[in-house]
Amino acid sequence: MKARDLHQLSIQELEAKLKELKTELFKLRITKKIEGLKEPSKIRDTKRDIARILTVINEKRRGQAV
């Protein structure tokens, strides 16, 4: 997921995507504990995507406040 793609989405769409990714991260962590993951880097990638979305949301909110 690219940051430039995220900038084109509205705050509501970003928040929906954020909720989706947090759910996915939760499921990945549970799967890792129970049976292990074939792709352990997927957790890291999901966390980075969450951070990107949060960054874009904060940038947009600061832009609206100014």
From Swiss-Prot:
The cross-references to InterPro entries, in alphabetical order and at most eight, read:
Ribosomal_protein_uL29, Ribosomal_uL29, Ribosomal_uL29_sf
Keyword Cytoplasm attributed: no
Q: Which GO terms describe its cellular component?
A: cytosolic large ribosomal subunit
Q: Which organism is it from?
A: Hydrogenobaculum sp. (strain Y04AAS1)
What biological-process terms (Gene Ontology) are attached?
translation
An example of a Pfam family matching this protein is: Ribosomal_L29
What domain of life is recorded for the organism? Answer: Bacteria
The name of this protein is Large ribosomal subunit protein uL29
Picking any one GO molecular function of the record gives: structural constituent of ribosome
Record keywords, A-Z: Ribonucleoprotein, Ribosomal protein
Q: Which family does it belong to?
A: Belongs to the universal ribosomal protein uL29 family.
